[in-house]
Amino acid sequence: GEAVDVGRWRGDLATTDLLTLALQPSVMWLGPEPTFAIANDQARQHMRVSNVANGFTTSLNGSGVIVAVADSGLDADHGDFGARVLSNTDVVGDGSTADRHSGHGTHVACTVLGDGSRGGYAGVAPQAELIFQAMENDNNGQFLSPSLNYILNQAYSQGARIHTNSWGSSQVSDQG
């Protein structure tokens, strides 16, 4: 196994060893790691962007706000971010924050705070600053899950008071 973060381990276990491990006093929870999935092709429809854009006008633009996004990875050179990427951190241990396999992390970050300079569509907070937490293993494209406590605390300590997580699983999981 490998240490994921404080108090969490990930690894394979033989079925015959499951009861032995479950009976250890320090073990609070055992379960399968959920398989996460992402979908880039449904955002405008699910977010009802057209309804919001046509419904009201506001002067809010995200100025002075730090937003954290935990997702696959980030194309940090994408023109919509400028110098507003405060940090781009690998939270799964593969040493990379790139968005090699899906583009989902960049898509989500642009939806939140893209300024529209790269394609004409601005995000909902185009002047906000970004803390990005990369959750995709670039070696195999697997989307991994650090503990929510870890990623939320890391982002909070860097000034983020908004954290968005646009991923999930069809499997039931209590991440402990």
Predicted stretch roles:
Residues 18, 105, 145-149:
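Amphipathic alpha-helical segments in well-structured domains
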Residues 14, 117, 147-148:
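Amphipathic coiled-coil/heptad-repeat helices and related helical stalk/stem segments
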Residues 1-56:
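Autoinhibitory propeptides
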Residues 18-19, 120, 152:
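Short glycine-/small-residue-rich flexible loop motifs, especially phosphate/cofactor-binding loops
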Residues 23-24, 53-89, 94-144, 157-162, ...:
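Subtilisin-like serine protease catalytic core
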Residues 11, 144-145:
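A conditional alpha-helix N-cap/helix-loop micro-motif detector
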Residues 149-158:
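Short, well-structured alpha-helical segments in soluble
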